Amino acid sequence: MNFWVTFIRLIVVLSIVFAFQIAVAKAACVTHEDCTLLCYDTIGTCVDGKCKCM
């Protein structure tokens, strides 16, 4: 039973990370301010038209 709990948690974490990477990849930006909301508490920068969260 412990194996299944760990397995399900792993799937959930990977799904969240994967979805977040897609959201960041799709976010087009012109200035650093465009990335501020996307990156929440971290510093967002605009690199080659895409947001990068530090």
UniProtKB/Swiss-Prot annotation:
Has the structural arrangement of an alpha-helix connected to antiparallel beta-sheets by disulfide bonds (CS-alpha/beta). Belongs to the short scorpion toxin superfamily. Potassium channel inhibitor family. Alpha-KTx 28 subfamily. GO terms for molecular function: potassium channel regulator activity; toxin activity. This is Potassium channel toxin alpha-KTx 28.1. It is found in: Secreted. One of its GO terms (cellular component) is extracellular region. It comes from Isometrus maculatus. The keyword Secreted applies. It comes from the Eukaryota.
